[in-house]
């Protein structure tokens, strides 16, 4: 595990085992400033800042992923493989077409997939839809 990386100035151990990951860097800052206690900036590269602090007594980090699959792939790969992160929770906003989903409702997605060639670059067959661990949200 070699840290820092080209995309992350943090040292090993700076990130918590659980990282909240919005796409927008300003949303990451908002989460750190409004929800984390004793938040400390651990990464500041290319406008993608990462913070580590405490939420309800649990050590948690938050870092933006930037826009698109290539960007989140880079950051997620480094967090898992270089920094020992165990759980990334993607947080953000989305549109809805269901009549019973209202503005500001919280929706927990069971899985997500894409019709891009991204999964093929990892030799995953077809439209791969990984299903997350329900432990962090139960």
Spans of features found by a protein language model:
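Metabolite-binding pocket within alpha/beta catalytic cores that recognizes anionic/polar moieties
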Residues: 1-138
């Amino acid at each position: 595990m070699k840290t820092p990386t080209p995309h992350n100035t943090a040292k090993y151990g700076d990130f918590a085992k659980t990282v909240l990951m919005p796409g927008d860097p300003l949303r990451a800052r908002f989460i750190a400033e409004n929800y984390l206690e004793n938040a400390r900036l651990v990464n500041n590269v290319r406008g993608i800042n990462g913070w580590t602090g405490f939420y309800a007594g649990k050590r948690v980090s938050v870092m933006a992923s930037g826009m698109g699959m290539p960007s989140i792939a880079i950051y997620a790969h480094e967090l898992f493989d270089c920094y020992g992160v165990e759980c990334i929770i993607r947080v953000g906003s989305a549109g809805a077409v269901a009549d019973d989903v209202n503005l500001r409702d919280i929706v927990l997605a069971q899985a997500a997939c894409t019709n891009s060639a991204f999964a093929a670059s990892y030799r995953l067959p077809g439209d791969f839809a990984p299903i997350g661990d329900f432990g962090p949200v139960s």
